[in-house]
């Protein structure tokens, strides 16, 4: 089985995972309340393109051979109540890590989250999973626009006013 932990709000990453899973004949299950909520909204609005039989319930995972399953999970930052953390520590009521599972954490730790995510990664290793994360593999692409992408948006939208509102002081100055 392949687990992919990502931000639930990253719908383009969800689409990438569905596309890759279908290309390789795998079913996809979702785990984590926010993952289910965001997926349902994106799917209902037509932002997720998938075959009708690709998505399965997490309770159906054991009905398929491990090489036919991808599980998309919340918890890429090691949040204590996230699905991946609960799965890693055998506190999830529907699924647990099995030796040989592959876990991809597709986000770089946000500064300050290193300790909790490495605690989860250590536990995944203890349970026999193969773990891929930003320090070992090229599995993270920023969800933030690059400087050139921001310039393009400004050129397209041509706002009358613009106020940078997110980031550290140095970032706000650079953005302005």
Model-inferred region functions:
Residues 1-176:
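Acidic/His-rich, metal-assisted hydrolase cores and their charged scaffolds
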